[in-house]
Swiss-Prot record:
Protein name: Arp2/3 complex-activating protein rickA
Top-level taxonomic group: Bacteria
PROSITE patterns: WH2 (PS51082)
Keyword match rRNA-binding: no
General function of this protein: Recruits and activates the Arp2/3 complex, which in turn leads to actin polymerization, promoting Rickettsia motility during infection.
Length: 518
């Protein structure tokens, strides 16, 4: 009861719009008095006009009157001229738009409208109508969007698909609605096939939507239906074979035309939009912005393609060893590249000297021999001093410096060593690359090597080797000074520093001395 009261209140608020609908119906009756059935319809319109209070029952009478007018137009369409049909369609469209705009403002009223339209169609379809007339009536009564094309303009579509007037979409939607009804009629006539029954429900559930999506769904269902007709035997289809063939051909042609028409409309609208843009006052500025965007997109695409290609090359290529960055005072392990960009391999190390070719010492006197013997025994009992630090890179040791023999006992080096002077590695690398200059040994008639005097030995002219010799001699002298200062007999005074080396006894002499003491 409350629902009916609410609907009545809503209808009374829309009284002016509903009065316009009644006046439009009266105008239709005046223009079509010659058609059979309009006299009764005119009486119904007069009764509606007398009732000033709008209620739900009055609204249902209005919907029934509009449905009867549409039935008469479908039934007597052949009797009307083309101009009269166009005028009647305009008035009907105006009536439908007003009724739908009133119903859209109330959900319950819209449901009542749909129920009443469905009920009227079922009653009118039972009357004497041909198949095409029944389809036409179904389109007029059930096509909500065809009667309200403004809904198409409100749909969120892209600009190429946006039709402000919605006239093209209205016609397109009407054609699709007729095709849908034809497909449903075909499936109803062949309801003895179970597969078609299932598809019939799906086709009937296609909702009112944008024409292209509806066309796409109809095409998909239509392909399935054709496959079912082809796969079934002729005995099953023998009853309606001729009608099925005609209907299938008719639907196929309509779908093809609707498809072509839709793409034609879309292409035309695209061209219209391009023309509108070209006529704008800032069209040149828009074109410049468009070109900049296009260039930016092209550059971005080329960069992406280049990155993908380089990534693919890195994945397919073999991994190469990375070059190690050496410090300034370090010697690299690989030889430098020459000006001709040819890599010269390092020279092979010199072969080891045979032990037989060691030169024999010169003959000396007995006194010198005993003194030399004492020095050798002292050197045998004292551990040798640590060798000087060698630079990296497998550099051969420098030749020994003169006979600066230190007789004092060397001590272990402290943890804090003096910093070594930096050595320029350029000349040293050249020497390594060019090979080593070995001393030439001359042999006598007896096959033994001829020794050379110290005076004959030439001083090394290479500044690198001379620098290394100086470093080594400085290291040895510093070690000797430390050992002398740390000895127990040294009192720290300059006069107490012993300059003579202690006499070292041999094992035989020590044993003889011990036996005498016993």
């Amino acid at each position: 009861m409350a629902k009916i009261t609410e609907l009545d209140h809503h209808l009374n608020q829309e009284k002016e719009a509903l009065d316009k609908v009644v006046s439009n119906l009266n105008e239709l009756c005046e223009h079509n008095q010659k058609l059979q059935g309009f006299i009764e319809i005119q009486k119904e319109v007069k009764e509606l006009k007398k009732e000033h209070i709008k209620s739900l029952s009055w609204f249902k009478k209005l919907i029934n009157t509009v449905s009867n007018i549409k039935y008469v137009f479908v039934k007597s369409e052949e009797q009307l001229a083309k101009d009269a049909i166009e005028q009647n369609n305009k008035l009907l469209k105006r009536i439908d738009n007003t009724i739908l705009s009133v119903a859209d403002k109330s959900g319950p009223l819209k449901q009542e409208l749909q129920k009443e339209l469905r009920k009227n169609f079922e009653n009118l379809a039972k009357k004497d109508l041909s198949k095409d007339q029944r389809e036409r009536l179904s389109n007029l009564l059930n096509n909500e969007y065809a009667a309200n094309p403004q809904k198409f303009a409100q749909l969120p579509m892209s600009k190429p698909l946006h039709f402000p007037n919605a006239e093209e979409l209205e016609n397109q939607h009407n054609d699709l609605k007729v095709i849908q009804q034809n497909v449903l009629n075909l499936l109803t006539e062949n309801s003895n096939i179970e597969e078609l029954k299932k598809i019939q429900k799906q086709v009937a559930e296609i909702r009112e939507e944008v024409p292209f999506t509806k066309l796409e769904k109809l095409n998909n269902f239509w392909q399935k239906i054709k496959n079912i007709f082809v796969n079934n035997s002729e005995q099953v289809l023998a009853k309606n074979k001729e009608n099925n063939t005609k209907t299938i051909i008719n639907i196929e042609e309509k779908l093809h035309k609707a498809n072509n028409k839709f793409f034609e409309l879309v292409s035309n609208k695209k061209q219209d939009i391009e023309n509108i843009i070209s006529n704008l006052p800032d069209s040149k500025r828009l074109e410049a912005i468009k070109e900049k965007l296009q260039k930016h997109i092209n550059v971005k695409d080329t960069n992406n393609i280049a990155e993908q290609a380089s990534a693919a090359q890195l994945q397919s290529a073999e991994t190469k060893p990375t070059a190690v960055v050496l410090p300034n005072n370090a010697i690299p392990t690989t030889p430098p590249v020459t000006e001709e960009k040819t890599f010269t391999p390092p020279p092979a190390p010199p072969p080891p000297m045979p032990t037989d070719n060691i030169p024999t010492p010169l003959p000396v006197s007995k006194a010198e021999a005993t003194e030399h013997k004492n020095v050798e025994t002292a050197a045998s009992n004292v551990p040798p001093p640590p060798p000087p630090p060698m630079p990296t890179g497998n550099v051969p040791p420098p030749p020994p410096v003169g006979d600066n023999t230190v007789t004092s006992t060397p001590q272990k080096a402290k943890e804090t060593n003096q910093p070594r002077p930096a050595v320029d590695t350029t000349n040293l690398m050249k020497q390594i690359q060019g090979g080593f200059n070995l001393k030439k040994i001359e042999y006598g008639e007896d096959g033994k090597p001829i020794p050379k005097n110290k005076e004959d030995t030439k001083e090394t002219s290479d500044p690198i080797i001379a620098a290394l010799n100086k470093i080594r001699s400085a290291k040895v002298s510093s070690d000797s000074e430390r050992s002398n200062s740390d000895s127990g007999t040294d009192s720290g005074w300059a006069s107490d520093v012993s300059t003579r080396s202690k006499k070292v006894l041999t094992r035989r002499e020590r044993n003889a001395k011990q036996s005498q003491q016993r």
